[in-house]
A protein has these predicted regions:
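Sec-dependent N-terminal signal peptides
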Residues: 4-14
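Noncatalytic, solvent-exposed loop/strand surfaces
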Residues: 15-175
């Protein structure tokens, strides 16, 4: 019951208190895929300079941007593993410098996924107030502190809710 309540809270009010430049979840604020920022440049200069670059490993998920931070997920394969073992992680980056502010990791094995899908997390993180929510490719749902990356809670959707495992892994962003 408590987990259901927590999941319900995650679903409620996902757009309150955003600044115009935030893109805190899949498809942006209110999931409309509309950016209502004003003052957008209409013509880009011929040569743009990269402001910052941060290497991340494999995955399909898009970034979430909120209150000066960029949240991304990836999968780091264990090169010594023959069974597709590795580590998934959420990174919080400073949006101005790209500095890694924190990283939250968990061990995982993609051996139950089709090999062609064993490339990393698929779900864009969601930011709401002081928590960022991330879904792992194998169905872990994590609630992390936006400022520190400390885990507030996590559930295993497969075990805790008897959910089946898609052959391509879990790909729904937490809404």
């Amino acid at each position: 019951m408590r987990r259901t309540f927590v999941l319900a809270i995650v679903l409620v009010g996902m757009g309150a208190g955003l600044s115009a430049s935030d893109w805190p979840q899949w498809r942006g604020a209110n999931r409309l895929a509309i950016w209502s920022e004003i003052g957008i440049v209409e013509n880009l200069p011929d040569k743009l300079q990269v402001t910052w670059r941060v290497p991340i490993d494999s995955g399909y998920a898009g970034p979430a941007v909120s209150r000066g931070r960029v949240f991304v997920t990836d999968w780091q394969v264990n090169p010594d593993s023959r069974t597709m073992d590795g580590t998934e992680r959420v990174l919080a980056l400073d949006e101005n410098t790209g500095e890694v502010l924190w990283s939250h990791t968990w061990r995982t094995s993609y051996r139950m996924l089709m090999a062609s899908y064993a490339i990393g997390p698929r779900a864009t993180p969601t930011v709401d107030d002081d928590l960022v929510y991330a879904v792992s490719a194998l169905g872990g749902l994590y609630a992390l502190d936006v400022a520190t990356g400390v885990e507030h809670w996590h559930v295993d959707l497969r075990q805790d809710y008897d959910a089946s495992m898609p052959q391509y892994g879990y790909s729904g962003s937490p809404l």
